[in-house]
Amino acid sequence: GEGFFDIHLHTCFPRLPNITRSNGTYYPSPEVLIQMMNSAGIAKAVVLSTLSPECRYTIVTPEETLQICNKYPDRLVPFCNFDPRYLTNSTKANFLPLLTAYKEAGFKGVGEYIPNIYLDDPLNMNFFGQVEEAGLPLTFHLAPQTGGYYGCVDDPGLPRLEKVLKSFPKLIFLGHSQVFWSEIGILKNPDERKGYPRGPIGREGRVVELMRKYPNLHGDLSAGSGFNAISRDPEFGYR
């Protein structure tokens, strides 16, 4: 069909009137989301669930996401989610029965995965192994540090991401956020990871290198970070 497929959207049923972010913004209702998609020429979209508390003003459970997607089955695709501290808050937690149940209910992936712990934290490694076994892709958000951010933490050069990609070769990872996309080029300084670096890309950065080396790493182009990565040097971006 015609139109775009957007792999990263958030929505929820309306909350109480004053339940918003501190700046007054909030997720669109399903009806408003569909209107936004129509006006942007988006045919289908993935709706993400968010369960980790970091930087949230509300939690969107997989069940709520599924309910919304079932109202618009030809337009919306549901992703489920967990926090790695679920069940036992240990590296022995068995997520597989729950992941399997969600997959059977029609969920097509996991995300947006945002716990603000190191990407290769043993809790994450336990969870990733089970997502790989369940055969679902995972959309993750990267953060530059613990505290003040949401998303899993990696260092400049993304060494932890490489370790994770190597450990779970059958798990499709969809990378997202400034910390991820700023490394489409070589970082001039570590602070660039927190923003939207501008200008032409001389040498290929770590994201490009990791994508070439690990076929299980894909890019989520949503939001300013993905758009900036592709558009800051159009010739490089489209290549």
Model-predicted regions and their roles:
Residues L16, L51, N116, V179, ...:
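Flexible, active-site-proximal loop/turn residues at the rims of small-molecule/cofactor binding pockets
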